[in-house]
Amino acid sequence: MGELFTFFGLISHDKTFIYMTHMLLAAGIALMLVKMAMSNLKVVPTGTQNVMEAYISGVLKMGTDVMGQEAARRYLPLVATIGLFVGIANLIGVVPGFEAPTAFLEFAFTLALSVFIYYNYEGIRRQGVVKYFKHFLGPVWWLYWLMFPIEIVSHFSRLVSLSFRLFGNVKGDDMFLMVILMLAPWVLPMIPYALLTFMAFLQAFIFMMLTYVYLGSAIAVEEH
């Protein structure tokens, strides 16, 4: 099976170049949508403003269900930005001639690492170093020696699962689309495109949800 055709690949076959150009394209589209939504704010929203307000409200409600309204509002800018960026990055891969930057492990891992570092920082900042790391010991003192390494490994596995879940699903979608186009290039595969579009939104939703869940668990004050 050959390489996935991309328009940017006509300029250079370098993997880093293709990855960076698609990532910058996703960032540019996200910034353009935000600018369009804020360029002519109205009391009764219409057009792009209406879509963006509905999106922000949905993200806030999701966060409220996970960690309460106050905390959800605090982290709304971060989670909403991640969701918008990841969603657009995923959707780019649905368009023939483009490849989702989330289909590159470098992108998915960097994004997951950023979330991992930030929620640990927030947990330490809000609870203190000792109290934050104490929850890795478990509730039974005589099992501390056993639970601590297990909890540490489990904690770092979040980084792996968060990055590989996004990368694996999006990369698989790209391969699926390539196979469909190879088997039936003369027929517009509407059903696969609809499915891939749904999956693009779903993966962005899952990434946002997990970000809220990890933030919520990091800042929660628990007594052991």
Curated annotation (Swiss-Prot):
One of its GO terms (biological process) is proton motive force-driven plasma membrane ATP synthesis. It is a multi-pass membrane protein. The keyword Cell membrane applies. Pfam families: ATP-synt_A. It comes from the Bacteria. Keywords: ATP synthesis, Cell inner membrane, Cell membrane, CF(0), Hydrogen ion transport, Ion transport, Membrane, Transmembrane, Transmembrane helix, Transport. Belongs to the ATPase A chain family. This is ATP synthase subunit a. It comes from Sulfurimonas denitrificans (strain ATCC 33889 / DSM 1251). The lineage of its organism: Bacteria, Pseudomonadati, Campylobacterota, Epsilonproteobacteria, Campylobacterales. The gene is atpB.
